[in-house]
Swiss-Prot record:
Localization, UniProt: Cytoplasm, Cytoskeleton, Microtubule organizing center, Centrosome; Cytoplasm, Cytoskeleton, Spindle
Record flagged with keyword Cytoplasm: yes
Keywords: Cytoplasm, Cytoskeleton
Name listed for the protein in its UniProt record: Mitotic-spindle organizing protein 1
Main location: cytoplasm
């Protein structure tokens, strides 16, 4: 028989697998590590909508920086 800690760990793993599948279906682009960080932040009281906005803004900034680097290296 599985210990309570082992059963809890299996439940956490299963929950994260389901969340990752939902994340993929929604095409969020989050990997397991990023999703895990987001879940932990939400569990600690961070507003999910604010977190989503920050992630989107960071992606925009990253894309803009990459585009800038590409145009600089090509010209």
């Amino acid at each position: 028989m599985a210990s309570p800690a082992s059963a809890n760990m299996n439940a956490v793993r299963e929950t994260m697998d389901v969340l990752l599948e939902i994340s993929r279906l929604l095409n969020t682009g989050l990997d397991m590590e990023s999703l895990s960080i987001c879940v932990r932040l939400c569990e600690q009281g961070i507003n999910p909508e604010a977190l989503s906005s920050v992630i989107k803004e960071l992606r925009r900034a990253s894309d803009s920086l990459k585009a800038s680097e590409n145009s600089t290296s090509q010209g």
